[in-house]
Amino acid sequence: MKVVAFNGSPKKEGNTYQAIKMVTDELEKEGIEVEIVHVGNKTIRGCMACNGCARNQDKKCVMSNDDVNEWIAKMDEADGIILGSPVHFSAIGGTMKSFLDRAFYVGSSNGGMYRHKVGAASITASNIKCSI
């Protein structure tokens, strides 16, 4: 069994990573192969809703100048998927959102690629007050 975990935090080993790591450590104890992918420090364009993935039916986004297609392939090959993100301004991080929009569009356009996978999410938040 293989699980891929995506860290949507810009901080490589911040709180989101620590939460994901707690889960993946337990999975590894059970003999499950685990890979953590750091998404949050990348530049990812959002989905353009061009329908190219639906037309091509190749399990890829037509935008190929970033790591998203590699990550989609990892999700397709995995038995389980963990998504981790900090909360920024009441939502998941922008990079993670862009990645997920594209991955889910590709997945739903290619026969529901992730339909029978085990999934989990980890959201981290802080109570730091800031004035804007």
Task: Outline where the language-model segments fall.
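N-terminal beta1-alpha1-beta2 submodule of the flavodoxin-like/Rossmannoid cofactor-binding fold
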Residues: M1-S109
